Amino acid sequence: MNNEEKIKQAAEILSKAKNIVGFTGAGTSAESGIPPFRGEGGIWNQYDPNSLDIDFYYRHTKESWKIIREVFYNFFSNKDIKPNPGHLILAKWEKEGRLSSVITQNIDDLHTVAGNSVVYEFHGNMSRFVCTKCGHKVDAKSLTLSEEPPRCAQCGGLMKPDFIFFGEGIPEDAYYGSVRAAENCDAFVIIGTSGQVSPANMIPGIAKRNGAKIIEINMEPSTYTNYITDIYLEGKSGEILPAIDALMTR
């Protein structure tokens, strides 16, 4: 069966669905010009991932911060990073009452910028900073990101980007929110993720066990494709999602 026929099938499933959940990974952001962390052209091919270990950040703060600022903030400030058509379709489906939430492994805030209001950020969000001492959070744009990491205006404590460093746990609200979303949906759309990062990679299986139809959009087969996926669509989500949307009944 070719992609065109499978797109029609996906559109039929999603048209009938009462509760769609999107599950996005690095491939979604790559279409907006953000390089992945792993694989060919990945960030960790150029930088030591230990720089994002939480213990390393505490023990070698200045060294760690230099890399964090360069990778996550200098890069983004020099690029015109914005939501791509795939992001926009997920936001459109929420507005139409079809999609209840997006579960994302990405930290770039693009789903919120696109217009989704219920986003479970499994790995946090780089657009915020959090105090490691008192937990106070601020918008990254309100800070001056100099050669020293920012300090908390409330208590003077060391701040860090509000995404998950190696050695930190998944935020409870994001984890339990993702589990509930997967349990309650009847259609689950996997987009741009290989399924290799734990524990996020367990979420699609929860949806499958609870009866959801699994639609997968990836550039190549993933760990899900031969095990839980009902319809596999190979290609860019920024092209496939609009094609599905155009065929959905309203």
Q: Where does each model-flagged region fall?
A:
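Conserved catalytic core of sirtuin-type NAD+-dependent deacylases
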Residues: 1-250
